[in-house]
């Protein structure tokens, strides 16, 4: 299934490989709140485009943070993989000469990177596994600021959600493979995805045009308020065969902790009908895939969309507010 992406007026779509020609901006709906933007989608047959500490510990002792002693650093350095310099964690396998390499790198190697000896047959190093179970390892993102040390069983789960891991480009459905720090996200969007429209204010209208385009389509725009930037996403996809649905959600260009300080409301309103969704914005670290999979966002099918649409255009009122902590 093709998956074109789209953004705001007079812009190229930010999430597609070949951006189409510029599009003349559409005027906002007369009934719109203070700020409004038209987001056009590009689909088949369409030329329009929218808008290192180590501490002796046992399993379950939890992570910690603190100064690193030379002795502890020397101990954890024994577990460093000579290829990727991450840590070799259980199950620990060695070459015939006793050298270690992590399991991820081992799958790509035909010989030991240290002595060039054979890696097969696989030999377990049970002594090092016992030592690893009594050591707290630094997070792999320690060099970018994470100070936690963790038992090896907790390390992978933490690193999947670590606030210091690189951020990926938040554009949904994009082929963009950019990664970088949180501070660099907005600069990336402004330079690599210039077509994304940004509106100022806590109350705006997200107007998606051509919602009847076939296939999977994304509409994206930015909202700036309270000193932060929020990404508004509307996706149309076939989550179940033969049943197309729309998914609308708000992401914060920020951390999960920062996101907890805000709330958002999405509202479809018209023809004496109203459909509302209120929630806490998700951090761009989490993305939209999991929220859509769990329907943890504003969800409605094409029949509902047509109740609120006007000539194939759908306006969503978006309100961002702060939460009292």
From Swiss-Prot:
Subunit structure: Homodimer. Interacts with VAV1, without mediating its ubiquitin-mediated degradation. Probable component of some large E3 complex possibly composed of UBE2D1, SIAH2, CACYBP/SIP, SKP1, APC and TBL1X. Interacts with UBE2I. Interacts with UBE2E2. Interacts with PEG10, which may inhibit its activity. Interacts with PEG3 and EGLN2. Interacts with DYRK2. Interacts with SNCAIP. Interacts with NR1D1 and NR1D2. Interacts with DCC. Interacts with AXIN1.
Post-translational modification: Phosphorylated at Thr-24 and Ser-29 by MAPK14, which mediates the degradation by the proteasome of EGLN3. Phosphorylated at Ser-29 by DYRK2; this increases the ubiquitin ligase activity and promotes degradation of EGLN3.
UniProt-recorded name of the protein: E3 ubiquitin-protein ligase SIAH2
Region of interest (SBD), ranges: 131-323
Zinc finger (RING-type) boundaries: 81-116
An annotated Gene Ontology molecular function: ubiquitin-protein transferase activity
One annotated Gene Ontology cellular component of this protein: nucleoplasm
List of residues that carry Phosphoserine: 6, 16, 29, 69
Compositional bias annotation for Polar residues: 1-15
Gene name linked to the record: Siah2
Keyword annotations: Apoptosis, Biological rhythms, Cell cycle, Cytoplasm, Metal-binding, Nucleus, Phosphoprotein, Transferase, Ubl conjugation pathway, Zinc, Zinc-finger
Composition bias type Low complexity, residue spans: 34-43
Pfam families named in the record: Sina_RING, Sina_TRAF, Sina_ZnF
Residue stretches of biased makeup (Pro residues): 17-33
Protein source organism: Rattus norvegicus
KW Phosphoprotein (keyword) present: yes
Binding site residues for Zn(2+) 1: 139, 146, 158, 162
Pathway given in the UniProt record: Protein modification; protein ubiquitination
Domain of life: Eukaryota
Zinc finger region(s), SIAH-type: 134-194
Domain notes: The RING-type zinc finger domain is essential for ubiquitin ligase activity.
Modified residues (Phosphothreonine): 24, 120
